[in-house]
Regions:
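Patatin-like phospholipase
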Residues: 1-45, 53-315
Length: 315
């Protein structure tokens, strides 16, 4: 298969925010990495910033392990089974009262406690490696205290500041508001959910945007004529932004991997992908020859053979 991107170039990688949908980006990164695509800069909003840190670390094994084994209580102080049932709308009548009580407690406490997420960031992210990487890394967040959007460069931060700003970038509206470094922050998606701007401002001419269609606002700005953006994104719904379920994440990683393959090699399809190496007329003629003289007429082919194939494939 012919690669549609240039291995001789280095690209900027923009990672959209979208909570639990983020597993998709790691699958896409795996395909890009296998294809030999290199990055001079990475930018991330929300979960895109957390994934971006692992990409800058170039630790695919860790990133896959994180998403293969993700569960709700790693991100929020909640009961995993209760959250799974809530996400799947599978709550037995006998447990409805206790579940509603738990939801009421979360509302009363003004959101989910994100102490587990803080711990997760500290355990997963090698802050020293990220801060001193040869790959520029930009974190997008929003300071509620200063009413200001921030595009922060990791090399300008110390290790503690980096972890705080990764958490700040991923501060979803459902999370309980707490100060980080003396200030309040909101998820970067409130101003720029697809952080292409940070890459353009820092001189990237070739950019790959990994979309997951999360919650937030796409920043409006003019992309210069000499900047080219390649987009990789899903054609199916990746699920709820709070559905931190391992099975869903594994499925989303697979989707990300194959969607990236589709873009990388110009493949056709949405649920499956094929390499289109011949024209439609040539493919039809080859099929007619394969079927033999009994199916040789175009009328028989269109009225009988094609409907049978479509039925077998459930098209």
């Amino acid at each position: 298969m012919e690669l549609k991107l240039d291995r001789n170039k280095t690209y900027g990688l923009a990672l959209e925010g979208g909570g639990a949908k983020g597993a998709y980006q790691i699958g896409a990164w795996k395909a890009l990495r296998e294809a030999g695509i290199r990055f001079s800069a990475v930018s991330g909003t929300s979960v895109g910033a957390l994934n971006g840190a692992m990409i800058v670390m170039d630790d695919l094994e860790k990133a896959e392990n994180v998403w293969n084994n993700i569960h709700f209580s790693q991100v929020m102080d909640v009961d995993d089974e209760e959250m799974r049932r809530l996400m799947n709308r599978d709550i037995p009548l006998s447990e409805l009262k206790s579940t509603l009580r738990s939801v009421a407690d979360i509302v009363r406490n003004r959101g989910f406690d994100v102490t587990p997420l803080r711990k997760w960031v500290a355990e997963v992210v090698d802050a020293d490696k990220v801060c001193h990487s040869d790959t520029d890394f930009f974190i997008v967040t929003y300071s509620l205290t200063d009413h200001q959007e921030l595009e922060l460069k990791a090399s300008d931060l110390d290790k503690d500041e980096l972890c705080d700003m990764l958490l700040a970038s991923a501060y979803l509206p459902a999370f309980r508001l707490e100060k980080l470094g003396g200030k309040y922050y909101a998820d970067g998606g409130v101003q720029d959910v697809v952080p292409i701007h940070a890459l353009v401002e820092n001189g990237c001419k070739d950019i790959i945007a990994l979309r997951i269609f999360g919650f937030g606002i796409e920043k409006r700005f003019r992309i210069p004529d000499d900047v080219h953006v390649t987009t990789i994104g899903p054609t199916v719904d990746l699920g709820n932004i709070l559905n931190f379920d391992a099975e869903q994440s594994r499925q989303n990683m697979r989707l990300g991997y194959f969607d990236a393959q589709r873009v990388l090699y110009g493949l056709y399809g949405s649920s499956y992908y094929i390499d289109r190496t011949m024209s439609e007329d040539a493919a039809r003629q080859q099929l007619l020859e394969y079927l033999g003289p009994d199916e040789g007429s175009l009328r028989t082919f269109h009225e009988k053979t094609l409907p049978q194939i479509a039925k077998a494939l459930k098209c």
